[in-house]
Curated annotation (Swiss-Prot):
The lineage of its organism: Bacteria, Thermotogati, Deinococcota, Deinococci, Thermales. Pfam families: Gln-synt_C, Gln-synt_N. Keywords: ATP-binding, Cytoplasm, Ligase, Magnesium, Metal-binding, Nucleotide-binding. This is Glutamine synthetase. It catalyses: L-glutamate + NH4(+) + ATP = L-glutamine + ADP + phosphate + H(+). It comes from Thermus thermophilus (strain ATCC 27634 / DSM 579 / HB8).
């Protein structure tokens, strides 16, 4: 829903809102906010609130740190009581774009990075890129001191019901809070692993979807805290069970119609769809550092846990990196299965859009789809079908990112440089850390 400044001011007064939260994300996808009281509402809506960009990961140097927060009125929402206790004063939220004081958009703002790629697709003649995510998360118990543990709150499995699924009450509160904030929830259920959950919300244009993912993650964490639980979007918190992914369904629309659908083509997939899929395959290795950005991400991308490890596509096969769900017509889409929910949603959707756009611009075509279970294919069979492997570690993913000029250009030089620097430091720290596994394995023997 679109709002005007006058409508927002009226709603703030009518609902007795005391605080307005201005929200952004850093390049790592962590939500940040500046909160202003009633006296500053009009100034905030005029985009005149300044903040120190040098304090935000990947933003600016200290000598050029003044930044402006310009709110997107379409993201206005009054936070429900489940999220913020009204006894302390009602709170509203606006997601902001970041600008320099001279009025230029800040190239290090992840939201701006995504907007650039959306405009690229519009220049190719498309209405927009649409995305539907499936974010998974774990609910863990907390210690008496409030610290998170990796002890699951249940022993339930896929689609199980209470009382086996002890997270059902928390999950319902999450759904109620999200609905109150304008989400259209399609399904909520227990996932395969103990303590693992999924809440699916309706697809939307890419920018709205990125905003929704960022909002979803902090709402889920807040509601979990209300129930004495810790919600984590860490991809693989426990060895030996399924990790958490964020399968993302993608489609392009043109003149109000799904541009991926062609009723007369093989698989009923248009040339546009094939070009887009080919672009995703071409740049899979280069963009995985963005869609799967943690050291821990690559412990999920291993055989045997329903996560892809090979760069391939299929009309139905879930072992492939890209799957084409059965629905056609307006619902024709490509499901990208490797992303995980630790990613920055703006940057992740930006590189997906860039990869697809490159496929369309160069008229790339994918190899034949793989219908067999790729996990059961031999190395020779995979080579025969020209199936490449996804990077197996964050280090390999960063090397692939360095070699992909399309993904680099999509991120922009500022984000590319700061993201790469932060992730290289993360890998270096991990590499020199002595882990418990090493002590358990070697200490007594050597």
């Amino acid at each position: 829903m679109g709002y005007t400044k006058a409508e927002i001011l009226k709603a703030l007064k009518g609902e007795n809102v005391k605080f307005l939260r201005l929200q952004i994300t850093d390049i790592l996808g962590v939500v940040k906010n500046v909160e202003v009281p009633e006296s500053q509402f009009e100034k905030a809506l005029d985009g005149e609130i300044m903040f120190d960009g040098s304090s935000i990961e990947g933003f600016t140097r200290i000598e050029e740190s003044d930044m402006l927060l310009r709110p997107d009125y379409n993201t206005f929402v009054i936070l429900p009581d489940l999220v913020e206790d009204p006894k302390r004063g009602r709170v509203a939220r606006l997601i902001c774009d970041v600008y320099y004081p001279d009025g230029r958009p800040f190239e290090g703002d992840p939201r701006y990075v995504l907007k650039r790629q959306i405009e690229r697709l519009k220049k190719l003649g498309f209405d927009n890129l649409y995305a539907g995510p499936e974010p998974e998360f774990f609910l863990f118990l907390r210690t008496p001191e409030g610290l998170p543990t990796t002890e699951t709150h249940d022993r339930a499995g896929y689609f199980d019901l209470a009382p086996i699924d002890k997270g059902e009450e928390a999950r319902r509160d999450m759904v109620n809070a999200l609905v109150a904030m304008g989400f259209e929830i399609e399904a909520a259920h227990h996932e395969v692993a103990p303590g693992q959950h999924e809440i699916d919300f309706k697809y939307a244009d890419a920018l709205t979807t990125a905003d929704n993912i960022a909002t979803f993650k902090w709402v889920v964490k807040r509601i979990a805290l209300n129930h004495g639980l810790h919600a984590t979007f860490l991809p693989k918190p426990i060895r030996g069970i399924n990790g958490s992914g964020m399968h993302t369904h993608l489609s392009l629309f043109k003149d109000g119609e799904n541009a991926f659908y062609d009723p007369n083509a093989e698989y009923q997939l248009s040339q546009t769809a094939l070009h887009f899929i080919a672009g995703l395959l071409e740049h899979a290795a280069g963009m995985v550092a963005v869609t799967n950005p943690l050291v821990n991400s690559y412990k999920r991308l291993t055989p045997g846990y329903e996560a892809p490890t090979n760069i391939a596509w299929s009309a139905s096969n879930r072992s492939a990196m890209i799957r084409i769900p059965a629905r056609r017509g307006v619902g024709t889409r490509a499901e990208l299965r490797m992303p995980d929910p630790s990613c920055n949603p703006y940057l992740a959707l930006a590189v997906m859009a860039a990869a697809g756009a490159d496929g369309i611009e160069r008229k790339l075509l994918p190899p034949p789809p793989i219908q067999r279970n790729i996990y059961q294919m031999t190395v020779r069979e995979r080579r025969k079908h020209k199936i490449r492997e996804l990077p197996g570690t964050l280090r390999e993913a960063l090397e692939a990112l360095r070699k992909d000029p399309v993904i680099r250009e999509a991120l922009g030089e500022h984000v590319y440089t700061h993201f790469l620097q932060a992730k290289q430091m993360e890998w270096d720290d991990y590499r020199v850390t002595v882990h418990q596994w090493e002590l358990d394995r070697y200490l007594a023997t050597y």
